[in-house]
Amino acid sequence: MSGTLYLVATPIGNLGDFSPRAVETLENADFIAAEDTRVSIKLLNHFNIKKPLVSYHEHNHVSAGQAILARLLAGESCALVTDAGTPAVSDPGEDLVRLCAENGVRVLSIPGCCAAVNALAVSGLPTGRFTFEGFLTVNKKSRREHLDSLRGERRTMIFHEAPHKLAATLADLRDTFGPDRQIALCRELTKLHEETRRTTLGEAADYYAANPPKGEFVLVVAGAQQETGAVVTLEEGVEQVLALREQGMRLKDAAREVAEHTGLSKNELYTAALNR
C-alpha cells in the first residue's frame, strides 16, 4: 500500500502560527521534502523535530519528484513544505501533487497560513469573488499580455511581488487599470513590521517610485466596475478600431485605445482587426 503525501502549510512570518497538527504531521512523517532545506531546518529546530530532509524545488522538481514518488509508492509518508505558506499554491509542489494523483497516491492538506487569503481579508476590498494571479513574469511582453487579459476582470485580483520589482509592477498596474483603481498593499504579513496601505494605483506608483520599498508584498487590486451603459461586443470594438485606423492611427494604438474604453482585450481587438 502506498504512503501519503502531506501538504503542510508553514508560517509566513510568525512561528506562533504553526499549528499543533502541523507539528505532529512533521514528527510522524518518514521524511520531509523542502523547498529550501536551509530555511526549513530552522523551523524544524525551533519545534525540535528530527526528520530526514530532501530537497524539492523549481530547479529539481522533475528528478526529485520521481524519487519522492518512488518512496511514497513503497509505503513511506512524506511531508511537503515550502519556505512560507501553503505548498502547491503558486509553487512547484503542484507538479508533485499531480504526479501523486496520477499514480494513486493519497494527498492530504494540513492547512495553515496563506499570504494571499490573509491579504484579501485585511484589504477592505470585496472578498466574495477573487482571482489569484501570483507573481507576474519579468518578461515585459508576457507581463503586459497577462495584465491586458485582466483589463475587464470584475473580481478582486491578488498578486505577489518582491520589493525590487514593486515600483515597475505598480506602474504597469496603473497603466493597465487606470490611476484611480483601488489597491491594498500588504507588506510583511504576520511579521513585526506588518503594514497595509490602502490607496489608488496612481498614488501607490508615485509613492514607491520615490520611496524604495522593503519586505515582501501582496497586492490586492479592486476589480473593474460594472459598466452601466451597453456592453460592447468584440465585433463592435473591432469596428471602432477600424474607424480609428481610417483616421490615421496605428492599429496597435487604436486597439489599445478601444480596449481602455470598452474593457475588451487589446490583443483580441488587434488580432480580429488584423484579420479583417
Regions from the PLM with identified roles:
Residues 55-63, 136-140:
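Conserved helicase motor
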Residues 2, 156, 163-276:
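A contiguous loop/helix-start segment that scaffolds small-molecule binding in enzyme catalytic cores
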Residues 95-153:
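Class I SAM-dependent methyltransferase SAM-binding "motif I" and its flanking Rossmann-like core
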Residues 34, 109-112, 159, 185:
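General beta-strand structural signal in soluble alpha/beta enzymes
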Residues 1-58:
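Glycine-rich, flexible N-terminal cofactor/catalytic loop recognition
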